[in-house]
Amino acid sequence: MSEYLFTSESVSEGHPDKVADQISDSILDAILEQDPTARVAAETLTNTGLVVLAGEITTTANVDYIKIARDTIKRIGYDNADYGIDYKSCAVLVAYDKQSPDIAQGVNNANDDPLDQGAGDQGLMFGYACDETPQLLPLPIWLSHRMVERQSQLRKDGRLPWLRPDAKSQVTIQYMDGKPHKIDTVLISTQHAPDISLDQVRESVIEEIIKPTLPQELIKGDIKFLVNPTGRFVIGGPQGDCGLTGRKIIVDTYGGAAPHGGGAFSGKDPSKVDRSAAYAGRYVAKNIVAAGLASRCLVQVSYAIGVAKPTSVMVETYGTGKVSNEILTQLVLDHFDLRPKGIVKMLDLLRPIYAKTAAYGHFGRDEPEFTWEATDKAALLRAAAGL
């Protein structure tokens, strides 16, 4: 019987890197609302009292970037300079260029088939699904997301008014024979008001945030709870750490349970395969697992800049497949259009839906806008596999 520990982490919407992600995706949404064919690569930097907006944007949309940045910071809850940044008084610098014409000529010029739009860059992307949770997401990352999400809820509804926006979570699960067996360790670090004691923070976080989130069937023996291990977390947000778009790519995906191609998501329009192909990979993998064709599934897809057809597609099921990986790969090629424009059409991605993705995970969430979480091709795949 094999036994091991596996850990994943998440961060709250008030973490400085996530503040940057949400600003970038809020700007993307505002542009797509007016101009669905825009080319957007919106990067954000946050620091004490400062937001810098840079990148490449080609659009006909008329967008107030500074207002969007301030509104996003306000929505997150940074309305006091003592928290690390204040939406009312922070400086916002804007430095956008247009997309390079060298890139645009490979992305904009389609052949006879309008779906033959070239990829916006080279790269490799992964999608993953497993049967550890009803959402077909690995349990450690799913639990980590739910804990910081609950921290935000309790902060915003006033039940724990001393909570501040910045927080991190980390969950360690003991696995036996490849399946979650019990919860081993839970760590939460949360920003808080200066006048509350560490004992109060620890008791409230354990009782109000951690315990209500834990699956009862995995509580076996003592769980190690770690809350604010440094003893104090008053200085946080962009004051505690500089935040950058795209610096939480493992939090955004599978918590380290699957490989990552290295490309971030936030601030990028769907012509960027870093984002759209990763969403498509998740869609493919989730449908394979939902079809009962495997209990774990990894999909890799790769692209060349300016070329529509993927340079490779691979399916790996780690010995859990009901049919061979080669058969599954052919099923994917037969039933999913993985050209960039095909992905955009398949998942209806030219919509202002991205700000919601920028905190608490892009995957494993039951949101109506998240078309890549649908399992509408599971029955088709199962029938095509002869099961």
From Swiss-Prot:
Pfam families recorded: S-AdoMet_synt_C, S-AdoMet_synt_M, S-AdoMet_synt_N
Cellular location(s): Cytoplasm
Pathway: Amino-acid biosynthesis; S-adenosyl-L-methionine biosynthesis; S-adenosyl-L-methionine from L-methionine: step 1/1
Keyword line: ATP-binding, Cytoplasm, Magnesium, Metal-binding, Nucleotide-binding, One-carbon metabolism, Potassium, Transferase
SUPFAM superfamilies associated with the record: S-adenosylmethionine synthetase (SSF55973)
Protein name as catalogued: S-adenosylmethionine synthase
Gene Ontology MF annotations: ATP binding; magnesium ion binding; methionine adenosyltransferase activity
Lineage top rank: taxon: Bacteria
Positions of the UniProt region annotated as Flexible loop: 99-109
GO biological processes: one-carbon metabolic process; S-adenosylmethionine biosynthetic process
Top EC class for this record: transferase
Residues reported to bind Mg(2+): D17
Gene source species: Methylobacillus flagellatus (strain ATCC 51484 / DSM 6875 / VKM B-1610 / KT)
Protein EC: 2.5.1.6
Name of the encoding gene: metK
